[in-house]
Amino acid sequence: MKAIISLLLISAMVFSVIEAVPVEEGLQLFEGERGCLPHNRFCNALSGPRCCSGLKSKELSIWDSRCLG
């Protein structure tokens, strides 16, 4: 029983540390990895629904996506 309570407390602490990083800051950290190119408003096809600077990604084809405001 003590092990379960300890595990729950550790999980809660880890979650609170992860939540301490603001979402916007987290998105900025991974913007380069997603291949966002804000100067021409294109996004990487693998970036999914998220895109550069909070823009939404619209798939024009399987290989081409454009960031829309």
From Swiss-Prot:
Instruction: Share the record's PTM remark.
Output: Does not contain a cysteine at position 57 which disrupts the cysteine framework.
What cellular component GO annotations does this protein have? extracellular region
| Pro-peptide region(s) | 21-34
Signal peptide positions are: 1-20
Residues modified as Leucine amide are L68
Q: Which Pfam families match?
A: Toxin_7
Q: Which UniProt keywords apply?
A: Amidation, Disulfide bond, Neurotoxin, Secreted, Signal, Toxin
Q: Does the keyword Hydrolase apply?
A: no
Say yes or no: keyword rRNA-binding present.
no
Give disulfide pairs as residue numbers: C36-C52, C51-C67
Q: Which domain of life is it from?
A: Eukaryota
- Relate the protein's function as given in its record: Insect active toxin causing rapid but reversible paralysis in crickets. No activity shown in mammals. Does not show effect on mammalian voltage-gated calcium channels.
Family under the similarity heading: Belongs to the neurotoxin 01 (U2-agtx) family.
Tell me the protein's name.
Answer: U2-agatoxin-Ao1k
- Which organism does this record belong to? Agelena orientalis
